[in-house]
Design a protein with these regions (language model features):
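Intrinsically disordered, low-complexity segments enriched in proline/serine/threonine
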Residues: 9-11, 28, 66
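Sequence-level preference for short, compositionally simple segments enriched
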Residues: 31-338
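N-terminal secretory signal peptides that target proteins for export/translocation
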Residues: 1-8
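Bacterial N-terminal signal peptides
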Residues: 11-26
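Small/flexible residues
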Residues: 5, 18-19, 292
Length: 338
């Protein structure tokens, strides 16, 4: 895998308006004088036994669920942790912090064709190596991996929580690497590798300066955006590359007919097909799918042969698409205000 060459310039301890501040104030305004920030809970996980726990899930389970409002910072030391990770809905404000995404790896190898206790295949949605059900989850410098390989659907991560953030992380898989099932998510300086539909789901998500690595002929996105949801996936200032060189991929295909996916200022190698988008043999999506680009560059970025049912945005239209507008929701969440 290609190394992430430019880690984000700030770490969680400094970048999130201080973790406790973020908890008390998601908009990241200053805390009023006289009000103290809550103290975070710090836990160290180390595979070599030098921390409080040797596996991540044990550290997660050590913190009681309930109405706790102080953030939990789990420092994961370098190592490969082969385990299923589950952050339950009641465990809000969890932060997984590694030291280097290439050295701190959370991995498992379930896939959809494995037989369950009833003798039937377990299916896509029971395969995530990591599952995030809780709101206000953050990860930094971590690799999330499904190591099953080219055997069918095999999720590296499933996110159902709202206001999740991932900084300088890697997501490694083959088919269905990342499922963003609901809520809002923000990815910055991340590396995402896969083959077929490897970023999919109904959530609203912003990807900033991410490297998308295509592992063969396939599809990058498969959004299932609800009709009444203004945005699905937005990629801004990203880079798309591929291996092997002769492979070709689509930017997306609609898992549901109102799929919404936008690429802004994204560099696209020749792996991106000239037509750009695929309709999944659903011609009705030509009227309903919301696919758009602005200023795509590189050999795969030319608009000349794009399908006529996808849109090329004007400069003004693109400028209006910001993290605050896309992710704001009812609470005004804006990760850029951290």
């Amino acid at each position: 895998m290609n190394r992430i060459v430019s880690p984000i310039p700030t770490m969680l301890s400094a970048a999130l308006c201080a973790l406790a501040m973020l908890v008390l104030n998601p908009g990241c305004q200053s805390i009023a004088p006289g009000k103290s920030a809550v103290k975070p809970i710090n836990i160290v996980v180390a595979a070599d036994g030098s921390g409080q726990f040797t596996n991540v899930q044990a550290a997660i389970m050590s913190v009681p669920s309930g109405s706790r409002t102080n953030p939990v910072v789990i420092h994961v030391k370098p190592g490969t942790y082969k385990e299923l990770i589950y952050v339950q809905r009641e465990k809000r404000f969890f932060h997984l912090v590694g030291e280097d995404p290439e050295k701190t790896i959370l991995t498992y190898d379930l896939h959809a064709n494995i037989k369950g206790s009833d003798g039937k295949p377990i299916g896509t949605f029971h395969t995530p190596s990591t599952t995030i059900d809780a709101d206000d989850f953050t990860a930094e410098n971590i690799t999330f991996e499904n190591s099953a390989g080219a055997v069918g659907q095999a999720l590296a991560i499933r996110v159902d929580g709202d206001r999740a953030m991932f900084h300088n992380c890697r997501f490694l898989g083959w088919q269905d690497t990342i499922l963003l099932n609901r809520g809002r998510q923000y990815f910055e300086n991340c590396y995402i590798a896969g083959h077929v539909d490897f970023i999919f789901g109904a959530a609203t998500a912003w990807f900033e300066k991410c490297h998308i690595q295509c592992l063969g002929d396939g599809y990058i996105t498969a959004a299932s955006t609800p009709a009444d949801q203004p945005f699905g996936f937005v990629f801004s200032n990203c880079k798309i590359t591929g291996d092997p060189p002769e492979a070709r991929t689509y930017l997306g295909r609609p898992w549901r007919i109102y799929a919404s996916t936008i690429f802004l200022n994204t560099e696209m190698s020749e792996i991106v097909r000239p037509e750009g988008w695929n309709d999944w043999k659903k011609p009705e999506t030509h009227q309903t799918a919301r696919y758009a680009e602005f200023h795509s560059t590189g050999p795969g970025g030319s608009p000349k042969q794009r399908v006529d049912w996808a849109k090329q945005l004007t400069k003004a239209e693109a400028a209006a698409i910001t993290p605050g507008k896309v992710l704001g929701g009812a609470d005004g969440w804006n990760p850029n205000n951290r």
